[in-house]
């Protein structure tokens, strides 16, 4: 069974692979594609100059076959496909060399994971109750805001009580002095 691949100089070469070597290559490429989901790893690659090498950019283009559903179903971190797509842009590759850019991308990935994906999972698990779930979350948000407002009011009242206590203590002391 033959397979086209890119060598380090960017040229297509026809190579004969055994079943075992195909399996190994599949696993290695799968792991590498999933590693692209980590913005810190992208920062590492960019700082080491990999994104400036033509053979590596060609390899990233070659890896786009992972977007095919038969391959994508093997991925544990599907956001890696978005990163792989973004890496096709020279501007994105250049910006990943800077720590703050990588940190920004990492923050966005974390926010996506924390909020959108959890809510989506709950909605997918309970499609009939999805509307009720959204309403109950809105009610919970309102209750949370009310609780915060009450806490703020109590906080505002406490300094007044402390001030009144100090004033009464001061007035008691001043009466004793007279």
Swiss-Prot record:
GO CC terms in record: core mediator complex; mediator complex
Region (Disordered): 129-178
UniProt key word Nucleus: yes
Comp. bias intervals (Acidic residues): 129-140
UniProt KW keywords: Activator, Nucleus, Transcription, Transcription regulation
Keyword Transcription regulation set for record: yes
Subcellular location: Nucleus
Polar residues bias (residue ranges): 166-178
InterPro entries: Med31_sf (IPR038089), Mediator_Med31 (IPR008831)
Compositionally biased intervals (Basic and acidic residues): 155-165
Coiled-coil residue spans: none
Gene3D superfamilies: Mediator of RNA polymerase II, submodule Med31 (Soh1) (1.10.10.1340)
A GO MF term: transcription coregulator activity
Pfam families given in the database record: Med31
GO biological process: regulation of transcription by RNA polymerase II
Function: Component of the Mediator complex, a coactivator involved in the regulated transcription of nearly all RNA polymerase II-dependent genes. Mediator functions as a bridge to convey information from gene-specific regulatory proteins to the basal RNA polymerase II transcription machinery. Mediator is recruited to promoters by direct interactions with regulatory proteins and serves as a scaffold for the assembly of a functional preinitiation complex with RNA polymerase II and the general transcription factors.
Family: Belongs to the Mediator complex subunit 31 family.
Assembly, per entry: Component of the Mediator complex.
Protein name: Mediator of RNA polymerase II transcription subunit 31
Naturally occurring in which organism (per UniProt): Caenorhabditis elegans
Source taxonomy: Eukaryota, Metazoa, Ecdysozoa, Nematoda, Chromadorea
């Amino acid at each position: 069974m033959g397979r086209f691949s890119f060598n380090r100089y960017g040229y297509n070469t026809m190579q004969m692979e055994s079943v075992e070597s195909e399996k190994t290559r599949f696993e290695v490429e799968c792991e590498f594609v999933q590693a692209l989901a980590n913005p810190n790893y992208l920062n590492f690659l960019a700082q080491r100059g990999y994104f400036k090498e033509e053979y590596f950019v060609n390899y990233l283009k070659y890896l786009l076959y992972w977007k095919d559903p038969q391959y994508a179903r093997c991925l544990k971190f599907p956001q890696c496909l978005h990163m792989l797509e973004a890496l096709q842009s020279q501007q994105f590759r250049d910006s990943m060399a800077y720590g703050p850019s990588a940190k920004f991308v990492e923050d966005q990935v974390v926010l996506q994971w924390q909020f959108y994906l959890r809510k989506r999972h709950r909605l997918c698990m309970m499609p009939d109750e999805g509307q009720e779930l959204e309403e109950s979350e809105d009610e919970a948000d309102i209750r949370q805001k009310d609780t915060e407002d009450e806490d703020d009011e109590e906080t505002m009242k406490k300094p007044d009580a402390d001030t009144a206590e100090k004033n009464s203590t001061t007035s008691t002391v001043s009466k004793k002095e007279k």
